[in-house]
Regions:
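Positively charged n-region of N-terminal signal peptides that target proteins for export
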Residues: 1-4
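Sec-dependent N-terminal signal peptides
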Residues: 6-8
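C-terminal motif of bacterial Sec signal peptides marking the signal peptidase cleavage site
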Residues: 13-16
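Tryptophan-anchored aromatic micro-motifs
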Residues: 24-40
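N-terminal glycine/threonine-rich, aromatic-flanked beta-hairpin/loop signature
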Residues: 43-81, 85-89
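An anionic, turn-rich surface loop/hairpin at beta-sheet edges
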Residues: 46, 82-107
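Hydrophobic/aromatic beta-strand elements that line small-molecule binding cavities or substrate pockets
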Residues: 51-53, 70-74, 102-108, 123-125
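Edge beta-strand at a domain terminus
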Residues: 72-79, 113-128
Length: 128
């Protein structure tokens, strides 16, 4: 009986220590396919580049450019708010124009595709 109780206690402790990803379709590793800049009226095909947004829990990481960016985000309704803690040198390479407080409208989000739009850019991603 003591062994069973000890085993149950261990299982409960192990299960309670895990954090569950509450991001739904947003969580994961996203490869940027296209960056459309409204200011310059240009569309940049980024499929050959390695521009990635990694999203997990409330953290995000930007990789593929000259430097790595790390920050936090909030997904509220149809908006994604990004606050970078470690701002990459080439932050516009990732579609950020105000890396300390950027807001994106979530145009489309499912398990395979994400489209974000700010007042400066529109970003197309596919899940990697």
């Amino acid at each position: 009986m003591k062994k069973v109780l000890f085993l149950l206690a261990c299982i409960v402790l192990l299960v309670s220590c895990q954090k569950l990803d509450h991001n739904g379709d947003l969580g994961g590793y996203w490869k940027m396919l296209q960056l459309e800049e409204f200011e310059r009226d240009t569309v940049i095909d980024t499929r050959q580049d390695d521009r990635f947004w990694a999203i997990q829990l409330d953290l995000m990481q930007l990789t593929g450019g000259e430097s790595i960016g790390k920050g936090r985000f909030q997904h509220v309704g149809d908006s994604l708010y990004v606050q970078m803690i470690y701002v990459p040198v080439d932050y516009r390479y990732y579609g950020l124009y105000n890396p300390k407080d950027d807001r994106f409208e979530v145009i489309h989000l499912d398990r395979k595709k994400m489209i974000l739009k700010s007042k400066y850019v529109k970003l197309d991603f596919r899940k990697f």
